[in-house]
Amino acid sequence: MGVRRFLNLFYDWEQHKLGDIGTLKNGMNFSKEAMGHGYAFVNLQNIFGNNVIDNHNLEFAEASEKQLIDYSLQKGDVLFVRSSVKLEGVGEAALIPENLENTTYSGFLIRFRDEYGLNNNFKKFIFAIRQVRNQIMSQATNSANKNISQSVLENLTFNIPIKEEQRVIGQYFSELDNLITLHQRKQL
């Protein structure tokens, strides 16, 4: 029998590998000449410390029509940091909250495209829990930076509740996140 949680739900959570419930794709690399003009793209700095991408502070780089399709960002996609100077930064994740037309993402990131139907608010928080973060960080390789590969993320295991419980959990943590943000603004 499942553990009692939100809404008196008693369903067991199912364990899944990330690679079994969606697809992963590394981002694109840009030359120096391609930077500063063209189309919007999401970079590392847009993810660190954020669980949702704010599309108002994006950089620009050239991209072909094919790249705009291959490296597109759709509502519900999650971007993971592939390479970071600090171990704590590798594997940080942020949700794409809406379709970002004509927007790509950096080669320092990996896109997860959900095929399972996870709740978007649930996705904002599930990849930040200690169990998931520890799995990712324990698999990071060491060079000049800490790195993870697609295969590390494909093999990432985590538990998923039924859709209604995902919705309730996601809503709860979104409201808590908003309350914390409001409290921080009041202190400024």
What is each PLM-predicted segment?
Residues L7-M28:
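Non-catalytic DNA-recognition/assembly elements of restriction-modification systems
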Residues M1-E14, I162-L188:
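Amphipathic alpha-helical segments with low aromatic content
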Residues N50-D54, K146-I148:
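Short acidic/His/Gly/Ser-rich catalytic and metal-binding motifs that mark active-site loops
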Residues N43-L44, G49, L58-A128:
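A short beta-sheet element
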Residues N102-F108, T141-R167:
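A short glycine-rich beta-alpha junction/loop motif
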Residues E33-V52:
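Short beta-strand/loop turn elements enriched in aromatics
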